[in-house]
Amino acid sequence: MNPDLIRTVQMGPWQHKVDDGLDARKTAYETMYTLIDTCLSKLELQAFLDRVVAGLIDTSDEIKVICHMMLFRLSQLAPVAVTQKLDDATPHLDKTMKGATMTKDTVKQDLERAAELQRSAVRAVVALSKVGGGVSPKFDALVDELKRNPTWSADFKESTV
């Protein structure tokens, strides 16, 4: 993310941040997702996974969802490479599962978007747990926490079937 591409726009009494680089980043991550199916054998997987993990901390929820989908797909196609990056990805997945801070002004659309992002993260964690169980203590703690959490345990069990 390039902070030079973020500008603040005045809309009446409110200020709104506009990310002029979002479309380019989104296209780049969608292209990366396509590369997984078209030329995985030609990719330098560790560098590729570094970019996927970097996408997990992007400010855009859309990019995070694409990265969750990439982790899901890579856990099936390149499990060894993915397990090597579990320690790097776990804090970002955990932060997503903790959710955004909600205030009294939070609108229903924002709540739904946050819930969809968390469901996407659960799907990624379930896929990663199938290949990375026991490899990373941090990741195992996240999996246990999700299984015990009343909000996410049903989604977790549903995704493991």
Task: Indicate where each model-derived feature is located.
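HEAT/HEAT-like alpha-solenoid repeats
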Residues: M1-H16, K42-L56, A81-T101, V135-W152
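Acidic, Ser/Thr- and Gly/Pro-rich intrinsically disordered linkers and low-complexity segments
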Residues: M1-A24, M97-S120, E158-V161
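Amphipathic alpha-helical interface segments within eukaryotic helical scaffold
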Residues: D19-L40, L49-V53, M70-L71
